[in-house]
């Protein structure tokens, strides 16, 4: 059982991975709950009884770094470089890139003010950031984190809308694959919304496999 409580200026968010965990944490005014569980009909029924709404289904993603035969260097069409996570452009891009992502929209109905506070917290905690640059402008970023002993995880990534079709996202993800291989990782992992077909297609292009579905439920008080 995991209960993570995060306090923001205007509200408190509890992230829970067990449907029984909430009972040990009394509700307060301005408290939002986000529960993520393995996809199963019983879990869905139980959470609905508790007053939660189904918000999203996420999928685990993995790119094997030992089996792939793709030439990822040929997929990189933009300049990719390390960047200070505190660069203001990173926060700006993040704030404009997730209009409905349930990692950040923790209210049953999307709320830009609330999601903005959650996004700011996420960006503040980024550690190993790479940016995509076009004519001196940062047009996208990707944060790469250790994942277990042998893998890496794409913790957060976003690209300015007008550069997505131009290959900026592919360049960032291909660079992440090469970076993970240089670190000696066996797999590059991620977790995405099953409704995000653009990112799903991007991962598929890079040879990823999908599995481990998890359902996201939210409730507010």
Each model region followed by its residue ranges:
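A conserved beta-strand-loop-helix scaffold within acyl/acetyltransferase catalytic domains
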Residues: 102-135, 139-152, 156-159
């Amino acid at each position: 059982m995991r209960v993570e409580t995060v306090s923001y200026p205007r509200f408190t968010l509890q992230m829970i991975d067990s449907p029984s965990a909430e009972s040990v944490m009394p509700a307060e005014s301005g408290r939002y709950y986000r529960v993520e569980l393995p996809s199963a009909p019983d879990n869905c029924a139980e959470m609905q009884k508790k007053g939660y709404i189904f918000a999203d289904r996420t999928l685990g993603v993995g790119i094997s770094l030992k089996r792939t035969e793709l030439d990822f260097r040929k997929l990189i069409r933009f300049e990719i470089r390390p960047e200070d996570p505190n660069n203001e452009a990173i926060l700006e891009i993040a704030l404009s890139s997730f209009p409905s992502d349930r990692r950040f929209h923790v209210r049953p109905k999307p709320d830009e003010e609330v999601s903005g506070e959650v996004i700011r917290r996420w960006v503040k905690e980024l550690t190993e950031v790479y940016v995509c640059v076009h004519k001196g402008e940062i047009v996208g970023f990707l944060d790469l984190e250790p994942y277990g002993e042998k893998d890496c995880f794409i913790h957060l990534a976003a690209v300015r809308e007008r550069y997505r079709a131009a290959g900026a996202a592919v360049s960032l993800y291909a660079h992440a694959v090469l970076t993970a291989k240089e670190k000696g990782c066996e797999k590059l992992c991620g977790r995405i919304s099953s409704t995000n077909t653009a990112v799903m297609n991007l991962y598929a292009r890079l040879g990823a496999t999908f599995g481990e579905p998890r359902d996201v439920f939210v409730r507010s008080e």
